[in-house]
Amino acid sequence: MNFPEFMWCGPQSGYCVIVMAMPHSDPLTPLMSLSGVEDKAASAVAAIARVHRRPAGLRKFDVISSESLLRGARAAAAIDGAPLDAHSIPPAVSAYSLLAPEKQAATVRTFARAPLQVLASIDIAASGVGHPDQNPAVVQALAQLITRGAGVDFDRLLPVVVHAEIAARSLFGARSTAVALVAARTAAIHTGFDPRGFAVPETFLNRHRADYRAALDTYGQDPAALITLLLDAWEAGAREADGIAQAA
């Protein structure tokens, strides 16, 4: 029996995987062999799961999700160096509106079947034109990865891979950070890595902005540095979400 397949090339030169449309195919498993990735992925998953198990995580999930989104949007704007004042709304903040409670379910459903449409919407909300500034083939391959990939490792790593590919390759030019952050949140809800969107990874990335920028710059040569940093951000974001849940 023949199965449809596609090729996704990872950050390192020559690292490509053929992803077949089969239930047991997990295209992101090779990334688990990178230094620190498996342990940090497990820690992030455990931290996020703890928040979701809290009573408030079950009863007041909309409150926690909304607060997470607000904090994430503000931190994302700060990462990009945008001033927050009463007279303007930075593009990064506008992009987060696609995950507002009344839009989240529709955005995630569309992302699962037509990720390019969601990426275009995020880019437009971030004051872009709705298509990548460069490397459209990479965006196409990333979209195929999103729609055809499956597996435990895929569920854990897709959010950080989506973030890394968009931000490190500057696929959407100056809007790449904002698009990457919102797309990563969408992917996390889609795969169940963070099913209700509780974590606030942006705060960690803003506090460690220099390390984040350095990891973006070296992604092609050292993908583990960025992937582990992003997993650290999700774990720290879960701890922040835990505080939100306790106060809810």
Predicted regions and their residues:
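FIC/Doc superfamily catalytic core
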Residues: 1-248
